[in-house]
Amino acid sequence: CTGEPGRDRDRPAAGAQMPEKAAAGLFGETERIGGGREDMLDKNKISLGIAPIGWTNDDMPDLGKENSFEQTVSEMALAGFQGTEVGSHYPSDPIVLKKALDLRGLRICNRWFSSFLISRPYEETEAAFLRELSFLKAVGAERIGVSEQSYSTQGILDQPILEGKHVMSEEEWERLVTGLNRLGKLAEERGMKLCYHHHMGTVVQTEEEIDRFMDSVDPELVFLLFDSGHCSFAGIDPEKVLKKYIRRTRHIHLKDLRKKVAERAARERWSFLKGVREGCFTVPGDGDVDFAPLFQIIEESGYEGWVLVEAEQDPARANPLEYAIKARKYIAEHTGL
């Protein structure tokens, strides 16, 4: 207590709603309206979040180990974001997690879930999936991002990311599709949507695999988690994929790619994790992905839901708060969000 006269009179009453400007972090309404950008995306339909992987990396815990959960979510709010996905260093108690986020005006929008449908008994994945659904429901999320991790090379340090990827057999395709449809039904029954994350080093990486996947799964139960960075790294035109599947997309990752670093990764046969360390990925506006047509597709489709900045890189090289602010400014200037 400071004991300064009049200090308490300036504070909002307990439970009072913060003024809109105060909740906007670094981006007051006047600043966001400036810059000559168009109000392309509707704030009433689209929420803007950022992933914690820019602060601490779940696959390489030494990257950002100095960044606490409290620092991470405080900086997200300060940079002007509305929500976050769940990171490995977040509290496992949904009550504790939700309270910490409520204090900062943040919400949980999604969490990564690793399925092993083609290499392990279905029941094993289902049990883990149900536990995850229960947790996400408790913290108010409506999406669960699933990636099939059977035979994934993304975490193998000596495996070149553009080589040796597992290609599914017909039987494996059937197991994957059948299993995901079952999981999608479980999610639907709980008021949630299963969004599948195509990803480097996994069984759904290439354009052909994405197309076959989308042609095979039940469109009422399994949706797409679109990731601009993973499309670009895989040599796919992200505009083409998003335009084709925007009506079936229920979660979006905005990830940029540094083309020269990605080309070096291919030339020198880097693993996925080395590529992350060396800076293949970055925030929107800092790399070579053209986001203008992606924003236009999102706007024209009437998409409703979350778009999330996700850019895993070494926080010692790319200060997380600095890059969060950079991404937030870029998106504000180009979309009006």
How would you describe each model-predicted region?
Residues 26-39:
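Short, Lys/Arg-enriched N-terminal segments with co-localized hydrophobic residues
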Residues 41-45, 74-78, 91-110, 128-141, ...:
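Acidic (Asp/Glu)-rich catalytic clusters
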Residues 50, 76, 84, 101, ...:
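Conserved, mostly hydrophobic/aromatic
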Residues 53-55, 87-89, 113-117, 149-151, ...:
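Active-site beta-loop-alpha junctions enriched in small/polar residues
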Residues 54-67, 116-125, 166-172, 283:
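Active-site mouth loops of central-metabolism enzymes
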Residues 62-67, 151-161, 261-274:
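Short, flexible, mixed-charge acidic loops at enzyme active sites
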Residues 84, 177-288:
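Acidic/histidine-rich catalytic cores of soluble enzymes
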Residues 122-224:
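Active-site acidic/histidine proton-transfer and metal-coordination neighborhood
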